[in-house]
């Protein structure tokens, strides 16, 4: 596996990773209605191109076949909005390696605190990376009640 910066040609694959991850992995922790609100359809690939150009660092994990298998992003303020792994690559350490690279980027940029709003399946992952749970957030997404967890990690 190799981790590199996003390329425009990755956008379609990242959209598919997001959608399949939410539908399959998220579906193990949320109701069908919640999952459908979170990922009502395959996102437009342009969403990922825009994310890569809005000032955040967008990293992509490339599998043995040369195709993206996971991705994660880091904003200049320390916010990690996305870390998504294809269901086929889940549980193999890909997300951990991707997170470690995002943390390395954060440290080199002088970021002192990382924060996330972690989904139910991501909560345990972030706790293993040293994040502390701040609070559970209850909110509506596309009109459906859902929750996530506000978490943070001080970098020292």
Residue ranges with predicted function:
Residues 1-3:
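Extreme N-terminal starter segment of soluble prokaryotic enzymes
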Residues 13:
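Charged catalytic carboxylate motif
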Residues 55, 79, 112, 145-147:
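Exposed loop/turn and edge beta-strand positions of beta-sandwich/beta-sheet ligand-binding modules
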Residues 93:
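Conserved G/P- and acidic residue-centered "switch" motifs that form tight phosphate/ATP-binding loops
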Residues 106-119:
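Conserved GNAT acetyl-CoA-binding A-motif
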Residues 115-117, 132-150:
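Conserved catalytic-core motifs of GNAT/GCN5-like acyltransferases
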Residues 126-127, 131:
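Conserved active-site tyrosine of GNAT-family acetyltransferases
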């Amino acid at each position: 596996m190799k981790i590199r910066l996003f390329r425009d040609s990755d956008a379609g694959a990242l959209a598919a990773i997001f959608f399949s991850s939410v539908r399959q992995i998220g579906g193990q922790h949320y109701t069908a209605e919640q999952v459908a609100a979170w990922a009502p359809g395959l996102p437009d690939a342009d969403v990922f191109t825009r994310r890569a150009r809005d000032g955040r660092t967008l990293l992509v994990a490339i599998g043995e076949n040369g195709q993206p298998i996971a991705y994660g992003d880091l904003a200049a303020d320390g916010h990690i909005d996305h870390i998504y792994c294809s269901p086929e690559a889940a549980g193999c350490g890909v997300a951990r390696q991707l997170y470690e690279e995002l943390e390395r980027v954060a440290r080199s940029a002088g970021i002192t605190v990382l924060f996330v709003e972690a989904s139910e399946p991501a909560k345990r992952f972030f706790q293993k990376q040293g994040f502390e749970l701040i609070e559970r957030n209850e909110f509506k997404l596309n009109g459906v009640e859902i929750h996530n967890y506000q978490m943070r990690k001080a970098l020292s």
